[in-house]
Amino acid sequence: MSGETPVKPVEVDNDVEALESAKELSLKIDLPACLNAGDSLSIPSNYDETINDLKQALSLLPLSRSLTNYTIYINGTNVSDSVDDLTTFSQLFELFQWDSVDLLKVTIKERAYTLAAVYEQISRFREIIGLHYVDRMAEDLGVASGVSRLNELTLNAVKERENQEEKDRNEKSEKDEKDEKSEETEESFVLNEEDIKSLKISAEDLSSTIDIDLAATAASFNNIHTKIKLPIKSLTISQWSPVPAFQKNKGDLLYLTLQTLENETFNITCHFSGFFVNRSSTVNFNPEVKVNEKGQVSKNYLLVNLVDSLSPSFSKVLEENELSLSTSSEHPETYLLPNNSFLATPWYIDTVHAKNYPDVSRSQLPLILNGVDGSDYVKDWNEDFQSVRELPNTNIQERILREKLIQKALFDFTKTATDTSVNIIKGNLTPMNPNEEEGKHIYLKNGIFYASDATSVEVFEATGAEEAARYVASKDLAGVKVLNKADVPGVNNLVTCIVDYLGKRIVCQAPVPGIFNAAAEGEEEKVVYGLSTDGSTISQDKSFEEPLKQIAEVFHLKPHTVEVSDEIKSESELLVSKDTKGIKGTDSRKYVIDLYRTTPRDIQFTEAHFDASNDTSYPHGESLLRHEAVAEWWKRKVSALFKAETEKLEKEGKMESKDGEKPQIVLPTDQVVFNPDAFSFDSESDEDREVVRNLSKFVKEKLIEEFLTEFPSQVAPFDGQQLTSILHRQGINMRYLDEQTKATYEPTLANYDALYRVTVQEMIARAAKHLLRKLSADVPVNLFASFVAHFHNCLLGAAVNAQPAVEIEELYRSFYPESAFNFTKLNSDQVIALITKEVFLRFRYALPEDWSSVLIHPIPLMREIALKFGIQWKAQKYVFTAQEFAAYKEKFATTSKQVETAKSKKKGKKIQVVTEVVSERDSIFVADDIVNFVPIVKDSSYKASLIDEIFQSARSHIASGEKDVGLSIFNELVAIQEQIYGRVNSETARFYTLLAQVYSELGYQSQAAFVSRKAIILSERTTGFDSYDTITAYLNSGFYEAANFDLINSVSLYNQAVATWTSVYGKGHPTLINTLTNIAENYSRASQNESAIKLLESALEFSKLANGEVSEITGIVTFRLANCLINTSKFDQSLELYRACEATFEKVLGPDDALTKQASKYVSSIETYVKELAQQAVASGNSKIKVKSQTETVKNGKKNGKKSAIPQPDPEIASKSIDDILQFIEGNNPKKSSKKSKKSKK
């Protein structure tokens, strides 16, 4: 991507080494008496760790986690009040001039509580008892977010195996190598009868056609949080709070009411000295200490200890919870809550997961969490973010802290902005301009500015209006994201996110400080660089030039003059686009906004497809290239310049100086730039326009062509998300989907067929998303489920009911205007026609007339639309044919409650009667099938370059032979990754995926298998249980388990991967061929040849359908099946397949290819062997009996006295490799391993 920070392995290397070599320090901690700790606590640390690290350690340790209000004394000095929490121990030693030591004495002392400290203690209490899990579920915008399925597979524990060091094989013969491998396989795959039975069942499942039951799949979701039991019934702020004036002087801070599991109610006083039970009741106020009949009082400094003393069940339930969590999964990542990322919400869910838990105190959380006066809720998000960006980053510790705080700040902003956006769209908040039309409403809430994308529609009136404004908003966010990663000093950008919910888009930004202030006297315009807000002037504040030069370098922008008209033009060259504005905030910082013009126009596409006067025009004329495309173009251009300069110096003989040093070549990178305002005005130079035109051509003529050329050797995408990710990484915009579709319409490979299928489906899904947005413009929030269900009936249910009706209560109709119900008039033909038109408008692709019946795969398409629009469907069997629907009609019947008014027998009074009405469905979907809608959020977070730098450093050490150093750096990197992103994050999932791969490459298969399980769980929870990241993680893990010689685990993981992608893609993904052949190979290694043959036959059958009978892939699968048949002595069948292979390879690869020659050799050898067996059979008169007798002879260890020219069938040959088998057929018995020889001698 453009603007990425270059890797500096040497500097990072030194930093990591410094991190590893940081002087160790042991902390001996004396805990306060309230913890009943007894002996001191020892914690390992080092001089580079901070006071905050110590506090975090104390909050995580079971012994001290309930302590929240304390003072830290080190060497008798109160450091809590004298230094901040980010101070390192080394800085403390320097500040207080202490002598360097290995053991540091730390004393923790209680503090007097304040109301803020009481709130903090209550929050920690809720966390300890598990209420934070319930809080998270209650406040989550999605249902069953973060579910996982790995634990439901009940895998065996990872086998611990020693790493196999690389051995010098040069001194050994090739035969010995094979014998060693064979011996290793025999020793490693140990299977009992139950294992073999399980493997046979798995092979049957994998080789048969898989039908996915959505309800059964959703029921397998593992949501550990639902297993948490609460150790109390409730703890709430008492009705006697706040503390009256006459009690404040006595030290009372707050009053609580506790209800225990024993159904006892206690009123608790929060005092500056701790917590105690008082004498109050629900009707009488008496905050004095309660003395029981034994003359005892219940008082404790810690709330958790007090509650424990009052409820015998409290500790017992806490212990049960801890046991439940530890036994439910060996990986804490399964149940840990993220602190700086969203969890993925499944697109279909079992309604069992849609639970609510009673908690009176939940509604009081804003009071507890937002400070004593609520001021903590109001944040200056811009100041928070900019302050963190300005933190020092001179060494690795500073960079880690800074990146961690940046990621946290970005997430907290996005979380708050998302919650508020949902409330705005639901109509719960009042806009700043209520008299304007709804699309132009703006809001300023909690330091964040909210606006619809339609607020800037006037700016793009000529180029698509609302469509252009919507597109430009996402491009602005992309520019912000690049700039966040580039981290340009001296200039600031706004923290930004976009929220799409119920067809509406809200752009959220922390505003420039002072932007809403009234203009100062003499100040006419707040924009000091770029085109003014009203478009009347172009400003060029000189103080912006230096930082903007760096921004221009990040985006490869060319300095250029701008002439909008004779009156409106720049005085000198602008460094960025005229639309990028520079503003000075009241905080004295420089800000840049409107970063959508940081890539050039896609002029070739716009000229060809946009015409505002044409009904079939592309929706807008603001099409821009992606940053990845510009970065690739720049890299190739610079590379060409470098090559040309090198060749020039070589010709001139200047490549080496007299002292042998090569000259430094300064790359003229300022030559590889483009004008971001090209094709905006008539005054631009032809040269600038030509550069932008060539850039536009570069995408279509180079990037797309290269993608299609390289695609056959790549893994075909499973779904639209993966396809989008692949194309975006290559710099290809999604508007070019038609190019892939046209190129793969008549596929020659299964991969192309899969690409065509996914591409068409993606176009339809995206068209459906846009139609849902357009058609819902007037639909009220409360009718949205009815609208979406009806749209899906029209799109997917024509075979069941082409004219579906929408049931809406008459009462609802009185609430809204008639236009709100226009969607009920839609039918299947109209929706199909609208989709066809939308696909052509957006992708310039004409769908065939029968696309709705031929190209659609209902469940995968339903999933794609759900993920794009934020729909959560109820998990049940959805059928899409009239025959299936009739069979399931009774099951689909819905029960609803109806309220009727009737006359009472007594005095004729009117009463309301509730009756249950059972009604049969006449369409596939009803509103009740939609469980929830979730917002789709695009944020400005980025991958920290520090992680990549350290990763590359570790890889380079390993590549240069310093394996131990490399692994040591990787171990440090695990901790750094978790520090920056937390243990539950999609970036952490991807990191574990890479780490598992590294371990596997180095031969650490046990570690690879273990780490890959973490990658699966985190992928499921953060990217989705059926995302391509998750599918890939399952496939990788299956491979690592096989390499670790655990076939049962491996097959379970492969089976899950196949089941998942079948629900995502449907039947017949080409990856199935490779997966089945890999599993078959493992079965064969485990001597489960019959199952291996079944799997290979299934793979071959599918390959013939997908790739054709005469294709390289079909030939290779046939070859493997032939090999496997030899293992079972089925020589005739094997020979037939080898002949087919030879013919296929000769046609596809040519007679001189290695595969063709190998197949030919096998044909010749086996023909000879089969002929000799036949001759022997004729001589004996009964081939079956003769072969059997020969086998029995070998089994009994008796050999023919004469040396026979015909090799005897060997029952042990099944365990040999194909080469050994062929050597046997050719008359050369393969040598057995030394271990086997020793065993036979015994």
Swiss-Prot record:
Compositional bias ranges of the Basic and acidic residues kind: 158-181
InterPro entries: CLU-central (IPR033646), CLU_dom (IPR025697), CLU_N (IPR028275), CLU_prot (IPR027523), GSKIP_dom_sf (IPR023231), TPR-like_helical_dom_sf (IPR011990)
Keywords: Cytoplasm, Repeat, TPR repeat
SUPFAM superfamilies with a match to the protein in the record: Hypothetical protein c14orf129, hspc210, TPR-like
GO cellular component terms, semicolon-separated: cytoplasm
Main location: cytoplasm
Region (Disordered), start-end ranges: 158-189, 1189-1214
Pfam families found in the cross-reference section: CLU, CLU_N, eIF3_p135, TPR_12
Keyword Cytoplasm: yes
Clu domain segment(s): 359-606
A biological-process GO annotation: intracellular distribution of mitochondria
Repeat (TPR) residue spans along the chain: 31-64, 109-143, 528-561, 947-980, 1073-1106, 1115-1148, 1150-1179
Keyword field contains Repeat: yes
Subcellular location: Cytoplasm
Top-level taxon of the source organism: Eukaryota
GO molecular function, one term: mRNA binding
Family named by the database record: Belongs to the CLU family.
Assembly, per entry: May associate with the eukaryotic translation initiation factor 3 (eIF-3) complex.
Function of the protein: mRNA-binding protein involved in proper cytoplasmic distribution of mitochondria.
Protein name: Clustered mitochondria protein homolog
Organism: Scheffersomyces stipitis (strain ATCC 58785 / CBS 6054 / NBRC 10063 / NRRL Y-11545) (Yeast)
Lineage: Eukaryota, Fungi, Dikarya, Ascomycota, Saccharomycotina
